[in-house]
Structure formats: structure tokens, C-alpha cells
């Protein structure tokens, strides 16, 4: 009689444990979606136009209007595409998490989610690394290659780019956590699935 009560208590406790983990993964994925979407939007809308004096002839200054856009740098374009794809991936995985039991094909759902999460980590990492390199070049220049810094002229452009990099880095860290959680979810199957 006492043994049956212990079994009921154990079954009751184990039945409740996976649910909080599911919501933790879901909430981390929502925050990662918000971070990568913010990085995408901030960088995609990043544009600054300035009129600069390039020379003076007599007393007349010669002015040139220059525009800094993310499209001018291929690394920033890749950054926007990578974070946009990560945002789409996270949105899709949120929907799979909410109604994933209906989409499970021969038990492959968890494996596919883990693989796609790892691919997304690699994609966001590449985009953030490329954009960080170009941001460093824009901030400090490269005296050996005679590339001048531009952040002293386009402060707002560089500030917005830095904010996008911070959001993308936060999204990358969250995506790494999600990837570990997805792999753990794949390796540790609930007891109801193993019987």
C-alpha cells in the first residue's frame, strides 16, 4: 500500500517536470527571436547622410554629401541576412514547439530541430564576426592598408551598427543555449517515449 502511494507520487512528479523545461526553452527562443530581429532591423535601417568639406578654393569651401548605408559593405549585408534567417528560424521553431507533436515524422522532429539550431548558430556567428571586423575597421581604420576610419564622421551610423552587433551577440549566446537545450532534449527522452 505504501509502495503504491510512492509510485503515484513519483509518477506525479515526473509528469510535471518536462513542462517547465518546455516553457524555459520556448521563452529563451522568444528572447533570441527578439534579439536577432532587433539586430536585423537596426542594421537594415542604419543610414546616415552628412555634408563634408573636402577642400577650400580661396574662401569657398567645396562640399560633398556622403551617405553611409549598410548596403555599402558586404559584411553588413551578410549580417542582416544571417540575423533575418535566424529570426525566421526562431519564429518557425516557436511554432514547432507549440504544435510540434502534430509535425513529428518518425520521431525525427527533435533531431531536425537540434541540427537546424546548430546551423543557425553557425550562420549568426559568421554574420556577427564579419560585421564586427568591419565595425573595427570603421572605428579605427587600417594604417597599413591606408584605410581611413569613418566613425569620426558618421557617429550615428557607427552607434547604430554597434547596437545591432550587441543585439546579435546576445542572440548568438541565446542560440548557443538553445542549441545545447535542443541536444539535451534529444538525448534525454521522456520515460513515456522509451516504453
From Swiss-Prot:
Q: Which residues lie on this side of the membrane: Extracellular?
A: 44-75, 131-163
Membrane topology reported for the UniProt record: Multi-pass membrane protein
Membrane topology (Cytoplasmic): 1-22, 97-109, 185-195
**Carries keyword Membrane?**
yes
| Gene Ontology CC annotations of this record | plasma membrane
Q: Where are the transmembrane segments?
A: 23-43, 76-96, 110-130, 164-184
**Location of this chain's protein in the cell:** Cell membrane
ATP-binding listed as a keyword: no
Record keywords, A-Z: Cell membrane, Membrane, Transmembrane, Transmembrane helix
Q: Which family does it belong to?
A: Belongs to the Casparian strip membrane proteins (CASP) family.
Q: How does this protein assemble? A: Homodimer and heterodimers.
Protein name stated in the entry:
CASP-like protein 1B1
Lineage from the top down? Eukaryota, Viridiplantae, Streptophyta, Embryophyta, Tracheophyta
Amino acid at each position: 500500500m505504501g509502495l503504491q502511494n510512492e509510485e503515484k507520487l513519483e509518477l506525479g512528479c515526473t509528469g510535471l517536470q518536462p513542462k517547465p523545461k518546455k516553457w524555459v526553452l520556448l521563452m529563451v527562443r522568444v528572447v533570441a527571436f527578439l534579439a536577432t530581429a532587433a539586430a536585423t532591423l537596426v542594421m537594415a535601417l542604419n543610414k546616415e547622410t552628412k555634408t563634408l568639406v573636402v577642400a577650400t578654393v580661396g574662401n569657398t569651401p567645396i562640399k560633398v554629401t556622403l551617405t553611409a548605408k549598410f548596403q555599402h559593405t558586404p559584411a553588413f549585408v551578410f549580417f542582416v541576412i544571417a540575423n533575418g534567417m535566424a529570426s525566421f528560424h526562431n519564429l518557425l521553431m516557436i511554432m514547432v514547439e507549440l504544435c510540434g507533436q502534430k509535425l513529428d515524422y518518425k520521431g525525427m522532429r527533435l533531431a531536425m530541430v537540434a541540427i537546424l539550431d546548430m546551423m543557425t548558430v553557425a550562420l549568426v556567428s559568421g554574420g556577427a564576426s564579419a560585421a564586427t571586423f568591419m565595425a573595427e575597421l570603421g572605428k579605427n581604420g587600417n594604417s597599413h592598408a591606408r584605410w581611413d576610419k569613418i566613425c569620426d564622421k558618421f557617429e550615428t551610423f557607427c552607434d547604430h551598427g554597434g547596437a545591432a552587433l550587441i543585439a546579435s551577440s546576445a542572440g548568438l549566446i541565446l542560440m548557443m543555449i538553445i542549441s545545447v537545450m535542443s541536444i539535451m532534449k534529444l538525448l534525454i527522452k521522456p520515460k513515456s517515449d522509451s516504453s
